[in-house]
């Protein structure tokens, strides 16, 4: 008999099916046994009256929580069963794998008259045994929602003539100004782990691909210990040609994110609200836009927050956080585009206007930066000069060549998929990454 997923088995009332999964909960008494079986689609109660099934007693007595079993039996309606009013009466139970006592506590266990409360293990302890922690409803929901979000964005772009590409992660020169890189030995020379696919996205524009996107790993050798930073994360990057302004890039991004959030809300909005207490809000467009200087002025008026003159060319961490309260109050929105940063704080390849102002933006969602986007400088002479100003011309010589033989005006942005997931579900980056990598974390 072929396996049936639990969500389909629940519909097969009166039928006999085979289900497989982990034992989430087990109650084994003298006369009855109740097993909550879980697979990636749902949960099903297995009810055993031992008097009717003496052949199953020895097998049931061997079972432990988180063991993996195969159960074949009849699906029945039972209004007293909480899981959809459905249970299975087993004909056979086969043990696939017996689990030892778990080394971590995944959820806090409340105190009873007979037992003390048991605290949940710390996030670092749970990451030590990440594969066990990932079995929880919350963790699996996060990655289902993440998959839905990414697939919706991919579909959005494919429907608009974008091509998906995959660029090298071993590169000859750092791709971002201001970001630390991981240096690796590459035979007789140095190479670096890519901080972004930026150079190669733009190469695709010079190649006439016009519209491209990529999902892939991003590496940042930054010793940051916040709840939103990681040394390796999954990026979602795109670039497209024949734009007239960085505002075209902003419009593309807000439409892309709206499509992604709509898909997540439709498929998982209720579950996210139930398990995380987070409302999935599909934003209205266009998103609010504010110049950096005007935001600082607004934050001073609203919250008394001030920064030194030397800091006003970039967004401080505290201003980033306060911007959420500010945009909610003034626009009733969760997203905020911030423009007009200092050229000193932006990458050399950002186009600048006649006043030297970079033609780009940051996008803030729920008080956290999720994107830097811009129109790129595609004119070789101007780009070379801007690279020289940053002291990078020799290091990026191969990149500058992309623009010597014709290149259309273009722009783009990059998103952190894990950070999107983190904000969507109200968790930390350690929760939102499948396997977190940070300054002190390289295993499992």
Regions of interest found by a model, annotated:
Residues 2-243, 435:
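Class II aminoacyl-tRNA synthetase-like tRNA-binding/catalytic domains
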Residues 271-285:
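Short, highly charged C-terminal tails/helix-capping segments
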